[in-house]
Amino acid sequence: GERLQAELTIHHPTTDDSLNVVIPWNRQTFQFTAKHHTLPTTGTVKIGNRRYTFNEEESYSVLDYGRGIWPREATWNWGMASQRMRGRRIGLNFGGKWTDGTGMTENAIFVDGVMTKIHEDVIFEYDRNDFMKPWTIRSKFSETVDLTFTPFFERVAKTDAKLIRSEVHQVIGYYNGIVKLENCS
């Protein structure tokens, strides 16, 4: 493969909100997660002879930090996005399945670093036989979230170490649709 060199600086605005959630499944198992969105990123990435420049007006990182003791079997969906739209930094965070039935969610939208929590579950609908087909992500009871996610890349990682088995599908793509804020914006 080609040589990869990266020198990136991730800026973390001190006034930005973060999403922090503890999900207690029972007395023995829990998960804490912290999500920091739309972190302006600058620098360069070089792959072989190609050089890519990142500027903080168009390039963002996300910090996803978690700790906990998970149940033996778990399934979850996570979707996120960071971008600039109409001059504002917009971040999306949606989680599903792993929080179902707990009364808590990791669903939120960030606008210029200010988080608006979405307290309702979202439903991820997709073809488990073809993760590259478009997905829908919708709020369970309202019209707050109504998105289509269209993947253009899939990374698959499978592990079978007898006691531990996992299958991860990471898809990268584009969102299209609507997320309605409480203030109707």
Q: Where do the PLM segments sit?
A:
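Structured soluble/peripheral alpha/beta segments that form catalytic or ligand/cofactor-binding pockets
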Residues: 1-185
